[in-house]
Design a protein with these regions (language model features):
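A glycine- and charged-residue-rich anion-binding loop/surface
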Residues: 1-457
Length: 457
């Protein structure tokens, strides 16, 4: 996951032309520090401590230019712990900056806000009004709180061995990696979903507190394996259900998550599984999309959504019946043509050879081939038909005695297919091929006897 986060950061820098990802590279004053107030405020004023544009520190940046802004105070959450950064705006008089990425520098003291100056001029020393995109922040909070509930539900259903192995929290989208030794069953997934949604519907208070790490451990707070923590830690609690060390942003009540839906579960490494899930508006979008699919399918089958499963079972049974009828008709057609084909056979080195172009479907051709292979043990048959797309389908079968005599359907069909612009192959007793030149088919079939003669000696 760490590598994936690095890749995302690189993509962000490439997309935005962001600069200032390490204060040392920018020549920024290492004594600079940004105070984060975004846990309790989505709007705040911050003084511009430094500006970077085109890879260099500068005193002012004009409209149309990309910029990285360092403030003394910010409500913008910087990407960390698997949670994506806040977006939003900064403004001062007629100056407006659109912020689309926020990162911390190497030691985490400086917040680097990257974006584009949309209008006016931003200068070092300006006081900017910072406004976080509230709707997006709320969607991210829904996902992050749901992630905590998901981990608790997984431990209840799968066992206490489940531990977080990584996560990515975006707007109404959850990606959660966890330790487990097997794929989850549909029943387990449904049970986990049910537990999470029941906790959401309970409307439990979500509290965040800072406390000494030893006190947090006594409370049973779960920590991320391998993570280093300071003496004072931030603890997030959802009622009495979940308690974890966490520096991310959260809802104040589980009910605000809306609903929770797992959309996939898969392996990402030995002993590590990954769940992708949706909350809030993305859950609603998925629900509406699937409801439309359900309604459209029901309409196509001339039934109601309530009776769709029963109608689908009926259609499947009807198709099975029609398939049986088609198979029966194909067999009858094959039987009718069999004697005509056998009468046209030629002897080649003791093997009965048939080469014929059929005006039938590929299915009928296969039925004829199966019968010929079974009844004409000492025979080889090359059959061909041209489909509606003017493409040739070829089939070669060889009876068991013909195979013993040296016949090989795969080798025969390969040579014949070459003559009509195609290729193919297969087993000694059965092989298929295709061709792209229908105008060459008659010539190819006329060559079958000589091809067999070259193989059966």
């Amino acid at each position: 996951l760490i590598q994936e986060q690095k890749e995302r950061s690189r993509e962000d820098r490439k997309r935005m032309g962001d600069v200032g990802w390490a204060s040392e590279d920018l020549g920024l004053d290492k004594s600079l520090k940004t105070e984060f107030c975004g846990y309790t405020q989505l709007e705040a004023e911050g003084n511009v401590l430094a500006l970077v544009s085109e890879g260099e520190s500068t005193d002012a940046v004009r409209a149309g230019s990309k910029v990285t802004v360092v403030l003394d105070k910010t409500p913008f959450y910087a990407e960390m712990g698997g949670q994506v950064p806040d977006y939003g705006t900064m403004s001062h008089g007629d100056c407006e900056i659109e912020i689309t990425n926020v990162q911390k520098n190497g030691d985490g003291r400086i917040y680097l806000h990257s974006g584009v100056v949309k209008s006016g001029v931003v200068s070092r020393g300006d006081t900017l009004v910072c406004e976080v995109d509230k709707e997006r922040r709320q969607a991210i909070c829904r996902s992050h709180t749901a992630t905590h509930l998901l981990q608790e539900a997984l431990r209840q259903v799968l066992g206490s061995h489940v531990e977080q192995a990584g996560s990515y929290t975006d707007a109404d989208h959850v990606r959660f990696d966890f330790t487990h030794f097997a794929a989850m069953t549909p029943e387990e997934i449904a049970k986990v979903e049910s537990i999470v949604n029941n906790i959401i519907l309970e409307g439990l208070e979500v509290r965040t507190d800072e406390m000494p790490i030893e006190e947090a451990k006594k409370l049973g707070a779960m920590a991320l394996f391998g993570e280093k923590y300071g003496d004072i830690v931030r603890v997030v609690r959802a009622g009495d259900v979940s308690i974890e060390f966490c520096g991310g942003t959260h809802l104040d009540n589980t009910a605000k998550a809306g609903m929770f839906k797992i959309v996939s579960e898969a392996s990402v490494a030995a002993g590590v599984r990954r769940i992708e899930a949706l909350t809030g508006r993305k859950f609603l979008e998925l629900f509406e999309e699937r409801q439309k699919t359900l309604n459209d399918t029901a309409a196509a089958l001339k039934t109601t959504p309530t009776d769709l499963v029963q109608r689908a079972d009926q259609v499947v049974e009807e198709i099975r019946g029609l398939t049986r009828n088609v198979d029966s008709l194909n067999s009858k057609i094959a039987e009718m043509k069999l004697s005509e084909l056998l009468n046209a056979a030629e002897d080649v080195n003791g093997v009965s050879v048939i080469a014929a172009k059929l005006d039938d479907t590929p299915e009928v051709m296969r039925s004829i081939g199966d019968i010929l292979k079974e009844r004409n043990a000492n025979g080889v048959a090359v059959l061909a038909t041209v489909t509606g797309e003017s493409k040739i389908q070829l089939l070669c079968v060889a009876g068991k005695d013909a195979v013993k005599a040296g016949a090989h359907a795969g080798k025969i069909i390969k040579e014949v297919a070459k003559l009509c612009g195609g290729g193919g192959g297969g087993r000694p007793d059965s092989a298929s091929a295709g061709g792209k030149k229908p105008e060459k088919l008659d010539e190819a079939l006329q060559a079958v006897c000589s091809v067999v003669a070259g193989i059966v000696k």
